[in-house]
Amino acid sequence: MAEFVRAQIFGTTFEITTRYTDLQPVGMGAFGLVCSARDQLTNQAVAVKKIMKPFSTPVLAKRTYRELKLLKHLRHENVISLSDIFISPLEDIYFVTELLGTDLHRLLTSRPLEKQFIQYFLYQILRGLKYVHSAGVVHRDLKPSNILINENCDLKICDFGLARVQDPQMTGYVSTRYYRAPEIMLTWQKYDVEVDVWSAGCIFAEMLSGRPLFPGKDHVNQFSIITELLGSPPDDVIKTICSANTLQFVQSLPKRERQPLSEKFKGAEPLAVDLLERMLVFDPKKRITAAEGLAHEYLAPYHDPTDEPVAETQFDWSFNDAELPIDSWKVMMYSEILDYHNVDQDSQGIHGTPLNTEAQRVPM
């Protein structure tokens, strides 16, 4: 049985195994608190993420289960990887991942990026997206703060809590506004992996200029700002709008012509502008893919088709439409944790046993 210790971080109780020491707060989001720690087993610095109240509602339980499944499945150099997971006696979930020193948001707010860093960061973002998309996964919330970077400029995409299956009927109001693809605002229904490419394009533009490209105050203002630069959406896109109110709003906007991005980004080299033009396209089906972006001439210094892998298997989304009670998500989550630690579930009494009585048996 693992031994647990408690620490207070920002008024939040961290209850972790003695394997992890030297807790220091790193960041806090809507769904979790992240601390850096020292892994006594490997002597490596790690990030420990506490999921806040994972079993308080079925929605949060499902979200946590989804993120756990994705972290277990996705294994790529440019995607954050899971190194440990455990449930504390208080029934909190803790994900342990590699620790990277900063994120792209912090870099962008501290200093302008030089060309070679912009190229290398964009290359790694697209390399990670190519892999994620090949697994049948859409991130849905790509933004600078979800892109982690270490002192060697290695980049990893993180925070897959909102990720979803590739689905032509995908719904929801998801990504942070500045990086949200127009098809999400226009339809709230039919969108796919192309939304991540749009977000990556917005991030690319921000790296080039040092400030957000589309800083909308709300979703109406956001869409209006997009049309000021990219022009009015084409008829093929307008035809996909499902909401009568949204259609009326779009048709009420003045007709606008697309502005040359070379005028907006006068200091950028032509190849950078050309790639950006291909990423920021209204029609998602005409938007460049992550794989195509990697092959663009702008990224030629880093492009290596033999070292840009795709996923070996598709992610299993069979659970995603399930509407289950909290106790069912608990048992499923515990099963995933036992599987991660290669523990025989029958010997641990998983079947028909309340999760909280077994949580401390997860081996570290």
UniProtKB/Swiss-Prot annotation:
Database matches in PROSITE patterns: MAPK, PROTEIN_KINASE_ATP, PROTEIN_KINASE_DOM, PROTEIN_KINASE_ST
Its EC number(s): 2.7.11.24
Binding site for ATP: 26-34, 49
Protein name: Mitogen-activated protein kinase HOG1
Cofactors that this protein relies on: Mg(2+)
Reactions performed catalytically: L-seryl-[protein] + ATP = O-phospho-L-seryl-[protein] + ADP + H(+); L-threonyl-[protein] + ATP = O-phospho-L-threonyl-[protein] + ADP + H(+)
Activation and inhibition: Activated by tyrosine and threonine phosphorylation.
Provenance organism: Coccidioides immitis (strain RS) (Valley fever fungus)
Catalytic residues identified in the record: 141 (proton acceptor)
Subcellular location: Cytoplasm; Nucleus
CDD domains (UniProt xref): STKc_Sty1_Hog1 (cd07856)
Gene: HOG1
Function: Proline-directed serine/threonine-protein kinase involved in a signal transduction pathway that is activated by changes in the osmolarity of the extracellular environment. Controls osmotic regulation of transcription of target genes.
Short sequence motif TXY: positions: 171-173
Annotated GO biological process: stress-activated MAPK cascade
Alphabetized InterPro entries for the sequence: Kinase-like_dom_sf, MAP_kinase, MAP_kinase_CS, MAPK_p38-like, MAPK_Sty1/Hog1, Prot_kinase_dom, Protein_kinase_ATP_BS, Ser/Thr_kinase_AS
Domain remarks: The TXY motif contains the threonine and tyrosine residues whose phosphorylation activates the MAP kinases.
Residues where Phosphotyrosine is found: 173
